[in-house]
C-alpha cells in the first residue's frame, strides 16, 4: 500500500490524537498549537538533497488567537510559532516514514526572519527539504526550510533537528 502524499486538517488532527500513523507514532500538537491547515506535498525522495520534502499551508485570518495578544495594537504572528511549525513538520515526516515514539525539537543551526505575518495576510506556506535521516537507536530528522507569507519568503531555517524518543523520562 502506498503512503498518502497530502493531508487535510482532519488528518492532521487525527495525527495529534495518535490515530493517523498509529498510537505509538509521533503526534502533532492539537488546537491552537497546530500551526498548519494542510500538507499539500510530502515525499521521501524529493527536495534539494533527494531525501524528502514537505510543503504545508496555514490559512491566515484576523481572528487567529495570537493576533489578539501579540501585540496589543500591533498584531503580528510570533516568529517562534512559525519556527515551531517547521519542527512540527519534521516530526510529522518521521512519523509518516514509520518512526515510533515521541517527537522533540532538538535545535536549529540558523534562523533568519526577514518579514512578518500580519492579520491581513492570506496564507503561510512552509517548505522543507530533508537533509538527513537517522534510523538507529536515535531516530532523527534534519531539514532546511523556508516560510512564505502570500508568496514572499520571510523566514529561513537551516539544520532543524527533531528526535523521536521511545522514553522521554530523562530528556
Curated annotation (Swiss-Prot):
GO terms, biological process: unsaturated fatty acid biosynthetic process
Pathway noted in the entry: Lipid metabolism; fatty acid biosynthesis
Keyword Acetylation: no
EC number: 4.2.1.59, 5.3.3.14
Record's catalysed reaction(s): a (3R)-hydroxyacyl-[ACP] = a (2E)-enoyl-[ACP] + H2O; (3R)-hydroxydecanoyl-[ACP] = (2E)-decenoyl-[ACP] + H2O; (2E)-decenoyl-[ACP] = (3Z)-decenoyl-[ACP]
Keyword Magnesium appears in the UniProt entry: no
GO molecular function (one): (3R)-hydroxyacyl-[acyl-carrier-protein] dehydratase activity
Transmembrane segments: none
GO cellular component, one term: cytoplasm
List of catalytic residues: 70
Location within or outside the cell: Cytoplasm
Alphabetical UniProt keywords: Cytoplasm, Fatty acid biosynthesis, Fatty acid metabolism, Isomerase, Lipid biosynthesis, Lipid metabolism, Lyase
Family in the record: Belongs to the thioester dehydratase family. FabA subfamily.
Role, per record: Necessary for the introduction of cis unsaturation into fatty acids. Catalyzes the dehydration of (3R)-3-hydroxydecanoyl-ACP to E-(2)-decenoyl-ACP and then its isomerization to Z-(3)-decenoyl-ACP. Can catalyze the dehydratase reaction for beta-hydroxyacyl-ACPs with saturated chain lengths up to 16:0, being most active on intermediate chain length.
Subunit composition and interactions: Homodimer.
Protein name: 3-hydroxydecanoyl-[acyl-carrier-protein] dehydratase
Source organism per UniProt: Shewanella sediminis (strain HAW-EB3)
Amino acid at each position: 500500500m502506498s503512503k498518502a502524499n497530502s493531508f487535510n486538517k482532519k488528518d492532521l488532527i487525527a495525527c495529534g490524537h495518535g490515530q493517523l500513523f498509529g498510537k505509538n507514532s509521533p503526534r502533532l500538537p492539537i488546537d491552537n498549537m497546530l500551526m498548519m491547515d494542510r500538507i499539500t506535498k510530502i515525499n521521501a525522495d524529493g527536495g534539494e538533497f533527494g531525501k524528502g520534502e514537505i510543503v504545508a499551508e496555514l490559512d491566515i485570518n484576523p481572528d487567529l488567537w495570537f493576533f489578539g495578544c501579540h501585540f496589543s495594537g500591533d498584531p503580528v504572528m510570533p516568529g517562534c510559532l512559525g519556527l515551531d511549525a517547521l519542527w512540527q513538520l519534521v516530526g510529522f515526516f518521521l512519523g509518516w516514514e514509520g518512526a515510533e515514539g515521541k517527537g522533540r525539537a532538538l535545535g536549529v543551526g540558523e534562523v533568519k526572519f526577514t518579514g512578518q505575518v500580519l492579520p491581513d495576510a492570506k496564507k503561510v506556506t512552509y517548505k522543507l527539504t530533508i537533509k538527513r535521516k537517522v534510523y538507529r537507536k536515535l531516530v532523527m530528522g534534519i531539514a532546511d526550510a523556508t516560510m512564505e507569507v502570500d508568496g514572499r519568503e520571510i523566514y529561513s531555517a537551516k539544520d532543524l533537528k527533531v528526535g523521536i524518543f521511545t522514553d522521554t523520562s530523562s530528556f
